[in-house]
Amino acid sequence: MLTADDKKLLAQLWEKVAGHQDEFGNEALQRMFVTYPQTKTYFPHFDLHPGSEQVRSHGKKVAAALGNAVKSLDNISQALSELSNLHAYNLRVDPANFKLLSQCFQVVLAVHLGKDYTPEMHAAFDKFLSAVAAVLAEKYR
């Protein structure tokens, strides 16, 4: 459960991400495909080469969904309900992959934000990403 301090840190973090979220989403996906190549199986129709417009577009969607969830910290489940349905019923993505993408997004933030990505912010974002992954996986049960 996110505390009031976590929510404050997440708002501060997303202010730092604003303006770069599309780039960060793209980098997180690219990093995931390199680090965890098995995740490519969910994107057979995508050009997965670096700089691919399809990956860039999907990264933009990932970052937008995270931004939407940051704005809805008191009801992440409702904010991501449609995405949860899509991933569970249509795309049938293994929920373990949400954690892989979360790790990659964390690395991208650490690389780009450096010292501005404090340990406290990292911990709050980790809790947030765990909540997002749980919401995206809740329809699988």
UniProtKB/Swiss-Prot annotation:
InterPro entries: Globin, Globin-like_sf, Globin/Proto, Hemoglobin_a-typ, Hemoglobin_oxygen_transport, Hemoglobin_zeta. Heme b binds at residues 58, 87. Keywords: Heme, Iron, Metal-binding, Oxygen transport, Transport. Signal peptide: none annotated. GO terms for biological process: hydrogen peroxide catabolic process. Red blood cells. Residues 1-141 form the Globin domain. Gene3D superfamilies: Globins. It comes from the Eukaryota. One of its GO terms (molecular function) is iron ion binding. CDD domains: Hb-alpha-like (cd08927). The keyword Iron applies. GO terms for cellular component: blood microparticle; haptoglobin-hemoglobin complex; hemoglobin complex. PANTHER family: HEMOGLOBIN FAMILY MEMBER, HEMOGLOBIN SUBUNIT ZETA. Belongs to the globin family. Heterotetramer of two alpha-D chains and two beta chains. Involved in oxygen transport from the lung to the various peripheral tissues. This is Hemoglobin subunit alpha-D. It comes from Anser anser anser. The lineage of its organism: Eukaryota, Metazoa, Chordata, Craniata, Vertebrata.
